[in-house]
Each structure stands twice: as C-alpha cells, then as structure tokens.
C-alpha cells in the first residue's frame, strides 16, 4: 500500500490498523538538538484521545506514546524518530457481523475493490485511529515551530450541524469538550449531541485551524503551493469532504474590490486570502477550514449489499463518535504543523541567504 507518507524534508510515515497490535510512525527530517520527551507529545494525544467525554466514542485507549529512536539524552539526534502507540481496548467481536457486508458510507467496498480483501475490524487501515500518529508527529512540528520561529497553531470547532460557532474567545477552546470558542453555544451543542445519541444518528461539522507568526515566503510554486499542500494535508483526514483557505467559497459572492487584501504602510487591511498569495505565505495569519461529513457508523438501519451482491439491512454496532468533527481539531492542527514544518525546512534549504528590503509586518 502506497500513500502512507507526507512531506519532502520533514517526512511522516504512519503504519498500523484500528484493531492491530499497535500504531506507529517514522518521522524524518527533524533537526538535531531539539529537547524532546514523550510528555511533549502526550498533551495533544490526550486532546484527541477517545473515551474522554460522553460526546465521543467510548473506546478507552490510553494512547501512551513511546519514543523508540532518534532521541538521546532528551534531545533529537537528527536521525529518524520512531514513535509507537499500543492498542489496548479493541473489541473486534463488535465487527464480526460485517465480515461479509459492506457498510454504506465507509471504505469497506472500495478497499475490497482495490486490494481484493479488507480488515473489517473497525475499518482497519481506513480507521481514524491512524490519526493518533499524525497528532504525535505534529506535536514535534508544533514544538519546533513555536520554539524556533514563534509560530502558534490552534484550531477550534466553528460549526456543528446548523449551529454556527463564532470565534469569540480562544481560551474557551480548551475549557469544554467541543473545542468550542463560543461559550454561549455550549448548551445548544449539548442538546444536539443528546438528541443524536437518542436517535442513533450523527452530524457533520466544520473545523477552523489557524497559524500565527508564519513568516512571509513559504511555499513552492507551482505544484507545491503552500495552500495546495495544506489542502492536501487536511483532505487526507478521515471524513473531510471539503477544505477552504481564507474566505474560501465565500469569494464567489464578493467583488474584486471587496476581496483583495489592500496594503497600506501599516500592513494588510484584511485577510480574505487566508495568509497565502500566489501559493506563498504573506506573513499574515494562515487560516483554513475543513468540512467533515456525519459519520456513517450509526444505529439507524440502512440498506447495503453483502459480498454475494444480495441486499441486506445494516445497523452499525461498536463504539463511535456522533460527531467526528470534535476530535478532528487536534488532527487538523497537527497536519497544518507538518506542512509548515516541511515548507520552513525547504525554504531554509534554498533561500536562507535571501534578504529583501520591502516591508514586513
């Protein structure tokens, strides 16, 4: 199976399945001499970890990460960093009924069409369980970006179903289980989640991720534009069906005089572009949004077929998230960090000596 690696200089390769013995990843390209411990990675893993609230799957995985290589005496050595997380709470028997049945809306049908077989236990490689390793690798990138460049990456839920969430206070994001920046909407979110659990249904969501302190100049035209790589990274997250950079699809209703980010001696006057112009960072906040579909793992009966092509009724068993967008917030942060880390290393390799006299803000 190809397609398990992202990045050019900062490269992350993940492996493992939902109900396998463990998940792991290899992180290449980390500069030497960076202080790094397992505790540095654990914080974000705990934010993504299942079973931490009544609103997410009750699969209880400690997600304790182990650093296997690439760190000596508490600092990175410049060699490959190996990371491992053991699976401890698999209930594979929950999936025995779908061994020969294709769950609608899942990768069961397409995986078997491609490979001629599939791991039906929790979706195998197609499960979002794999994203734990992205978060671990992304934590390395977030640490480097923050300490060396002052770059801060943060994300939040900005819509669940038909409930829009305004970014009122970033401090609120870590104070509630929804990663919600709008405290006034917490009761509405709770009511929606309770209704979904009662109905056995699910709902979609929108997640916003932002990076501040990013220097101007990151991005490689034309096929490795920074926004293209960010979109690629976010679209690779399970259940993501759409990505917007900056104003995104809202630009359709705008005129050029409204959308252009005018510049004065004090700097840019707006940021409709999301901090990227011509595929290269402008020095403004980088802003991206992603839409996540409602999970198909629901107890509402639905039609599908078995491997013999016979129509059957399907009710999903197991432990699942009514809204996968909630735990996607730290995953989105990780993927943005991985892309920015890669582009910073690439920019430094080619353009470290470039000096310009034009203003920076």
UniProtKB/Swiss-Prot annotation:
Superkingdom to which the source organism belongs: Bacteria
Free-text remark on how the cofactor is bound: Reduced FMN (FMNH(2)).
Name of the protein in question: Chorismate synthase
Family of this protein: Belongs to the chorismate synthase family.
Binding site for NADP(+): 48, 54
One GO MF term attached to the UniProt entry: chorismate synthase activity
Pfam families for the chain: Chorismate_synt
PANTHER family: CHORISMATE SYNTHASE (PTHR21085:SF0)
GO cellular component: cytosol
Binding, FMN: 125-127, 238-239, 278, 293-297, 319
Keyword Lyase: yes
Stored InterPro entries: Chorismate_synth (IPR000453), Chorismate_synth_AroC_sf (IPR035904), Chorismate_synthase_CS (IPR020541)
Cofactor(s), names only, from the UniProt record: FMNH2
EC number: 4.2.3.5
Catalytic activity: 5-O-(1-carboxyvinyl)-3-phosphoshikimate = chorismate + phosphate
PROSITE patterns to which the protein is assigned, alphabetical: CHORISMATE_SYNTHASE_1, CHORISMATE_SYNTHASE_2, CHORISMATE_SYNTHASE_3
Organism (species): Salmonella typhimurium (strain LT2 / SGSC1412 / ATCC 700720)
